[in-house]
Amino acid sequence: MSQTVFITGTSMGIGAAAVRLFAQRGWNVAATLRNPADATFTDLPTVRVYALDVTDEAAVMRVVQQAHQDFGGLDVILNNAGYGIVGPFESATDAQVQQQFATNLFGVFSVTRAALPLLRAQQSGVIINVTSVGGRTAFPLNSLYHATKFGLDGFSEALWYELAPFGIRVKVVAPGGVATDFATRSLQMTVDPADDANPYIGQVRSVLDAFSSHGGTYSSAEQIAEVIYTAATDDSAQLRYLAGADAQQLLQTKAEMSEQDFMSMIRQNFGLA
């Protein structure tokens, strides 16, 4: 019998790549996204598309239960929906702060809470949370994004312990840079980069330039999806999976350097020294 994966945030990038990979390897896929018209995988016969905004808790409960009913069970929950906000924290609006947490963190909480009774009942399942290398180290002007990803990493580690007695495994996949349109379509700013009067504008432009200049080192969404598939199928108790050579190199460098030296290096890399 085919297994089923429930995936959030499938309109593009890692989510869309994961849908295709799981489907190509014989899985049933419950693919969720805010606007089903954006789905690029309707040609795949084992994929069913569901409209879902993960910040709508009632909708999350309804869609998770519907997918469970449609497929006769759920084996893997892939919490992938998320986006980034870049810019000085001082310039962030309350709405931006709340929306960043609602999508990147509270949405994961809602999906996980909706799925847990179903997974406990079958005494099996895998929950995979897509965090980021930014859940293990921080970059300038990404304070809100890092707050959600550090939070998701800690949440996942704690959940690993409490769900193990029920046969449910928790995994974290932490990509480095990903060559998708995340940096355009899924990126918001707390400040207008053209606002010369903003006291942080020099930092803003340096950070944006640094992100752009490193694009050649980023992994493809398909490469990240392969790591996700491994996490879903390796039958191990491993918690964390780094995805991408840049993520592995960065955290290795962090482990080998003093905190002060590492942070000085990050400042230099972002043109802030």
Q: Predicted segment positions?
A:
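Residue(s) in the substrate-gating loop at a strand-loop-helix junction
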Residues: S132
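The beta1-alpha1 cofactor-binding region of Rossmann-like NAD(H)/NADP(H)-dependent oxidoreductases
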Residues: L52-R62, D94
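Active-site helix of classical SDR
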Residues: T112, T148
